[in-house]
Design a protein with these regions (language model features):
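Charged docking surfaces used in two-component/phosphorelay signaling
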Residues: 16-24
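Short hydrophobic/Thr-rich beta-strand motif most characteristic of the beta2 strand and flanking loop
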Residues: 26-33, 41-42
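Active-site beta3 strand of CheY-like receiver
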Residues: 45-51
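Receiver (REC) domain active-site loop signature in two-component systems and cognate sites
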Residues: 56
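C-terminal output helix
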Residues: 107-116
């Protein structure tokens, strides 16, 4: 079964681009237009990973991350900050806030796919270790 990826971004074009890039690799995609929709989607069906735009209206990416990390069901979802902010301090702030990875727009499909593949492998390794199967 393909891994489920949640994309949270308020711009339709951004969600479509991310979806197309990820679907070519066989990922199952769920989309949300804002942080509230993304939180509801994650609670209904916990995704293998989430790509989160930091600058969404209503509940932004920072608030969404805090909400996901506060709930035991969604706490361990690997979360990637997706943003137009490319400064080193922006990346550092996102990682310190609890994002597992950071990617700035614009990016290449290969860069995104390698990042997603890496966080899914890392997440699978941590899950196996938590279940007692990791050695």
């Amino acid at each position: 079964m393909p891994a489920s990826i949640l994309i949270a971004d308020d711009y339709d074009d951004n969600r479509e681009l991310l979806r197309l890039m990820l679907e070519t690799e066989g990922y199952h995609i769920r989309e949300a237009r804002n942080g509230h929709e993304a939180l509801d989607a994650a609670m209904a069906e916990v995704p293998a990973a989430a790509l989160i735009d930091l600058s969404m209206p209503s509940l932004d990416g920072w608030g969404l991350l805090r909400a996901l990390r506060a709930d035991s069901r969604t706490r361990s979802i690997p979360c990637v900050a997706v943003t137009a902010f490319a400064a080193t301090q922006d990346r550092q702030r996102a990682l310190e806030a609890g994002f597992d990875a950071y990617i700035s727009k614009p990016f290449r499909a290969k860069e995104l796919l390698e990042l997603v593949s890496g966080i899914l492998r890392k997440g699978a390794g941590e899950d196996a270790h938590k279940d007692g199967d990791g050695r």
